[in-house]
């Protein structure tokens, strides 16, 4: 098997692009697709103050390495939402990558906002899915940190499979509001909302995994145990099966949506500032502050 670009022995075969590549040209190919996404969707510039949210997983840490390699100045943020051994391992991996990249790493402990409780403990207390609580907490703290520290954009490791599965779910349920706003870049719609960008949207998840492996990038091998049973995994499975039969269909599906889409509508009706914390919300009190109140109320009811 020879590299399509140079004729040297190939390291990988990418069925969805019908090409075979050596390690050097594979890296170049993946990195160029990241650069293409950044420029095509006007995510940020060379002088932007960029904050990447890292979890320790293959996507965020690989993107971290790519952005540094492409010449962008990037600081990283790790939100510690639990106390488990996996969370500790994730933090160690993130710290190792920060050392390798000589990059500033910020760590925010989410449990400090909930009297020391992890998202898992809050989930049990309130009888709500962990993913729901974790999402609320991470989105809020990510934006809060970025805004208060003057960052121009927050970057996340969402890949093509992530975005295509969300798109499929939104179409199947006719979530018109979400379909209107789904885009690789969410611009600023309020002074206290920092833009969010997804530079990996043109890259398949399996290619990011290959990139991390070939380049020996430290990352968590296992997925979050609480994601088991998530609806998004059902949509990903459907797309994987389609991809087996028709290589490239996931990319065509997502790009077709972006190409045919009219100007995205990012404005959110009724956006105002939370009366508790002052951050944007569509309700009187934002979901993060409501969550804090619910936890505080439940803790006060629990006998010592």
From Swiss-Prot:
Pfam families: ATP_bind_3, TtuA_LIM_N. Its EC number is 2.8.1.-. Pathway: tRNA modification. ATP binds at residues 53, 79, 138, 157. It catalyses: 5-methyluridine(54) in tRNA + hydrogen sulfide + ATP = 5-methyl-2-thiouridine(54) in tRNA + AMP + diphosphate. GO terms for molecular function: 4 iron, 4 sulfur cluster binding; ATP binding; metal ion binding; transferase activity; tRNA binding. Binds 1 [4Fe-4S] cluster per subunit. The cluster is chelated by three Cys residues, the fourth Fe with a free coordination site may bind a small ligand, such as exogenous sulfide, thus acting as a sulfur carrier. Its cofactor is [4Fe-4S] cluster; Mg(2+). Keywords: 4Fe-4S, ATP-binding, Iron, Iron-sulfur, Magnesium, Metal-binding, Nucleotide-binding, RNA-binding, Transferase, tRNA processing, tRNA-binding, Zinc. InterPro entries: Rossmann-like_a/b/a_fold, TilS/TtcA_N, tRNA_thiolation_TtcA_Ctu1, TtuA-like_LIM_N, UPF0021_CS. GO terms for biological process: tRNA wobble position uridine thiolation. [4Fe-4S] cluster binds at residues 131, 134, 224. Zn(2+) 2 binds at residues 274, 277, 286, 289. It comes from the Bacteria. SUPFAM superfamilies: Adenine nucleotide alpha hydrolases-like. GO terms for cellular component: cytosolic tRNA wobble base thiouridylase complex. The keyword Transferase applies. Signal peptide: none annotated. Zn(2+) 1 binds at residues 3, 6, 22, 25. The keyword Transferase applies. Catalyzes the ATP-dependent 2-thiolation of 5-methyluridine residue at position 54 in the T loop of tRNAs, leading to 5-methyl-2-thiouridine (m(5)s(2)U or s(2)T). This modification allows thermal stabilization of tRNAs in thermophilic microorganisms, and is required for cell growth at high temperatures. Can use free sulfide as sulfur source in vitro. Homodimer. In TtuA from T.thermophilus, the sulfur inserted into the nucleoside comes from the C-terminal thiocarboxylate of TtuB, but there is no TtuB ortholog in T.maritima. Belongs to the TtcA family. TtuA subfamily. This is tRNA-5-methyluridine(54) 2-sulfurtransferase. It comes from Thermotoga maritima (strain ATCC 43589 / DSM 3109 / JCM 10099 / NBRC 100826 / MSB8).
């Amino acid at each position: 098997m020879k590299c399509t670009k140079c004729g040297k022995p190939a390291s990988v075969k990418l069925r969805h692009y019908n090409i075979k590549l050596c390690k050097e040209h594979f890296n170049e190919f993946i990195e160029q697709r990241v650069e293409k996404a950044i420029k095509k969707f006007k995510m940020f510039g060379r002088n932007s103050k960029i904050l990447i949210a890292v979890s320790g997983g293959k996507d965020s840490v690989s993107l971290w390495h790519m952005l540094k390699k492409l010449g962008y100045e990037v600081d990283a943020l790790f939100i510690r939402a639990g106390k488990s051994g996996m969370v500790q391992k994730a933090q160690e991996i993130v710290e190792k990558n920060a050392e390798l990249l000589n990059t500033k790493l910020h760590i925010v402990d989410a449990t400090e906002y909930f009297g020391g409780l992890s998202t898992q403990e809050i989930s049990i207390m309130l009888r709500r899915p962990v993913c729901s609580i974790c999402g609320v907490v991470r989105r809020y703290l990510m934006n809060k940190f970025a805004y208060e520290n003057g960052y121009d954009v927050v970057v996340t490791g969402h890949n093509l499979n992530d975005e295509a599965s969300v798109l499929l779910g939104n179409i199947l349920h006719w979530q018109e509001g979400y379909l209107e706003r789904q885009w690789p870049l969410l611009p600023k719609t309020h002074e206290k909302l920092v833009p969010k960008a997804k530079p990996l949207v043109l890259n398949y998840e399996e290619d990011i995994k290959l990139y991390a492996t070939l380049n020996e990038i430290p990352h968590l091998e296992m997925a979050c145990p609480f994601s088991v049973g998530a609806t998004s995994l059902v949509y990903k499975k459907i797309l994987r099966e389609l991809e087996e039969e028709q290589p490239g269909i996931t990319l065509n599906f997502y790009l077709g949506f972006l190409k045919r889409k009219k100007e995205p509508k990012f404005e959110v009706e009724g956006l105002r500032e939370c009366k508790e914390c002052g951050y944007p919300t569509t309700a009187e009190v934002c979901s993060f502050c409501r969550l804090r109140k619910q936890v505080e109320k439940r803790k006060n009811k629990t006998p010592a």
